[in-house]
Curated annotation (Swiss-Prot):
<comment type="function">
    <text>Catalyzes the release of premature peptidyl moieties from peptidyl-tRNA molecules trapped in stalled 50S ribosomal subunits, and thus maintains levels of free tRNAs and 50S ribosomes.</text>
</comment>
<comment type="function">
    <text>Hydrolyzes ribosome-free peptidyl-tRNAs (with 1 or more amino acids incorporated), which drop off the ribosome during protein synthesis, or as a result of ribosome stalling.</text>
</comment>
<dbReference type="GO" id="GO:0000049">
    <property type="term" value="F:tRNA binding"/>
</dbReference>
<keyword id="KW-0820">tRNA-binding</keyword>
<keyword id="KW-0694">RNA-binding</keyword>
<dbReference type="GO" id="GO:0072344">
    <property type="term" value="P:rescue of stalled ribosome"/>
</dbReference>
<dbReference type="GO" id="GO:0006515">
    <property type="term" value="P:protein quality control for misfolded or incompletely synthesized proteins"/>
</dbReference>
<dbReference type="InterPro" id="IPR001328">
    <property type="entry name" value="Pept_tRNA_hydro"/>
</dbReference>
<feature type="active site" description="Proton acceptor">
    <location>
        <position position="20"/>
    </location>
</feature>
<keyword id="KW-0963">Cytoplasm</keyword>
<comment type="similarity">
    <text>Belongs to the PTH family.</text>
</comment>
<dbReference type="InterPro" id="IPR036416">
    <property type="entry name" value="Pept_tRNA_hydro_sf"/>
</dbReference>
<feature type="site" description="Stabilizes the basic form of H active site to accept a proton">
    <location>
        <position position="91"/>
    </location>
</feature>
<keyword id="KW-0378">Hydrolase</keyword>
<feature type="site" description="Discriminates between blocked and unblocked aminoacyl-tRNA">
    <location>
        <position position="10"/>
    </location>
</feature>
<feature type="binding site">
    <location>
        <position position="112"/>
    </location>
    <ligand>
        <name>tRNA</name>
    </ligand>
</feature>
<dbReference type="GO" id="GO:0004045">
    <property type="term" value="F:peptidyl-tRNA hydrolase activity"/>
</dbReference>
Amino acid sequence: MKYLIVGLGNIGPEYHETRHNIGFMVLDALARANNLSFTDGRYGFTTTLSVKGRQMILLKPSTFMNLSGNAVRYWMQKENIPLENVLIIVDDLALPFGTLRLKSKGSDAGHNGLKHIATILGTQNYARLRFGIGNDFPRGGQIDFVLGHFTDEDWKTMDERLETAGEIAKSFCLAGIDITMNQFNKK
């Protein structure tokens, strides 16, 4: 069985390890932990992680964030992956740094990547893992904040949070969304 695990982010070295690129960071950590490397393909960088007979196609879209839906649709069609086997990993301003929340569906919460995915897929009924990046910015400073780098305090727990996010993605594929939400959302 195949799953598409999409980490949202922006391409380019200027966005490397910025808050808005936490989706890329989760997939990079998951690939690194399994000695995998990404290859450049159409609409994104991919690698495949096999876990207990399940194929997890990890996708870092090469489109800009607000065009992420194009990459998601392309890889779903190319690999014949149903919507219920898709997980989007995204940054979330509404959650404190490091908080992880798996949801089976929901609004885009003002996130342009999720907004475009919903527009292209014609539904908001897809799983998403929200990775809290906090919201410690002055009024009007949202863009600078999400495109900014993590604090030294954030980095103290980053590896553990990235590892947990990877475990959530694997559990999504192995145990399903309901069991995974019950297991991880309370932490």
